[in-house]
UniProtKB/Swiss-Prot annotation:
InterPro entries: Aldolase_TIM, BATS_dom, Biotin_synth/BioAB, Biotin_synthase, Elp3/MiaA/NifB-like_rSAM, rSAM. Its cofactor is [4Fe-4S] cluster; [2Fe-2S] cluster. Pfam families: BATS, Radical_SAM. Its EC number is 2.8.1.6. This is Biotin synthase. Catalyzes the conversion of dethiobiotin (DTB) to biotin by the insertion of a sulfur atom into dethiobiotin via a radical-based mechanism. Residues 55-280 form the Radical SAM core domain. It comes from the Bacteria.
Length: 334
């Protein structure tokens, strides 16, 4: 009697051997795997990551150039000016950005991402970001990424010319669930910005937040929609409910579902950098974070996030050392 192939058997052939991501229906099977098969999923996802992405972990620091006062209503975000949130509008000057980049580089990070809480940049923000990128590159050996909202073609071209090597604009969630998360702009607007970024030659970075109330079907849909972007990087956040936001009372995502999701995203995007981002400390804790780093994740944000505290950088660096995970460096000195 022939034993029917499981989804993990299929993934070994399709993803590990051939480098072809799973489709939406296949991802649903991964997301509903029984708990006792999660270790097998993590092991397979790790093998896929090693084969198609290599063994190095990329480390990134982020900083907010403009915090708070955003006119959009993203229901998870405490930086919206529409909610009763404790976050207030603050701008950083260029010397502070350069110093933050220097401190980030000292951790071994190869990327420094400058973020602003806006729908899209005005001329003041564009000019300040261009000047900041040039100033950082003149003093720090680190790549600079940016995330300043929706862009038009002229703005995309200016950022590329200034030396921004990667642009982040998260799709946030599945297209079918997006109206439950944001009402002041559309999923398609975000997608169009990413198209322009790719055309300009910058690397595309787009992910989202899991555990916002989406169904498993929508989580699988989201993974496939991200894969269609052919992104260089996908940040994986897990909802950390923020006081004063519409999602303040949402429950934390179950750690087992988070691990299944990480495995599923790796099997959907075998060649893509999957970056640990916000909420992992609460959702997964130390043990779950270690499982994920040996289960498909190959990049991390270290230090604090935009409006929430992360783990101390030293703790994350110690964890990677304990797991014997090499950190990517910009230049290898022989």
């Amino acid at each position: 009697m022939t034993i029917p192939a499981t989804i993990l058997d299929t993934a070994r052939t399709q993803v590990l051997e051939q480098g072809i991501g799973l489709n939406q229906q296949q991802l649903m099977e991964v997301l509903t795997l029984p708990e006792e098969q999660i270790p097998d999923l993590m092991e397979l996802a790790h093998q896929v990551r090693l084969k198609w992405c290599g063994e190095e972990i990329e480390v990134e620091g982020i900083i907010s150039l403009k915090t708070g006062g955003c006119p959009e209503d993203c229901h998870f975000c405490s930086q919206s000016g529409l909610f009763e949130s404790p976050v207030r509008s603050v701008w950083l000057d260029i010397p502070n950005l350069v110093e933050a980049a220097k401190q980030t580089a000292k951790t071994g990070a190869t990327e420094f991402c400058i973020v602003a809480a806006v729908k899209g940049p005005d001329e003041r923000l564009m000019t300040q970001l261009e000047e900041a990128v040039l100033a950082i590159h003149s003093e720090v050996e680190i790549e600079v990424a940016a995330s300043i909202g929706t862009l038009n073609k002229e703005q995309v071209d200016r950022l590329a010319a200034a030396g921004v090597h990667r642009y982040n604009h998260n799709l946030e969630t599945a297209r079918s669930y997006f109206p439950e998360v944001v009402t002041t702009h559309t999923w398609e607007e975000r997608r169009e910005t990413l198209r322009l970024v790719a055309e300009a030659g910058m690397e595309v970075c787009s992910g989202g937040i899991l555990g916002m109330g989406e169904t498993l079907e929508q989580r699988a849909e989201f993974a496939v929609q991200l894969a269609e972007l052919d992104p260089h990087e996908v940040p994986m956040n897990f909802l950390d409910p923020r006081p004063g936001t519409p999602f303040a009372d949402r429950e934390l995502m179950d750690s087992r579902d988070a691990l299944r999701s990480i495995g599923a995203f790796r099997l959907a995007m075998p060649h893509t950098m999957l970056r640990f981002a916000g909420g992992r400390e609460l959702t997964l804790g130390d043990k779950g974070s270690e499982q994920a780093l040996l289960g498909g994740i190959n990049a991390m944000i270290v230090g604090n996030y935009l409006t929430t505290l992360g783990r101390p950088m030293e703790d994350d660096l110690d964890m990677m050392d304990r797991l014997q995970l090499p950190i990517k460096v910009l230049n290898k000195v022989i």
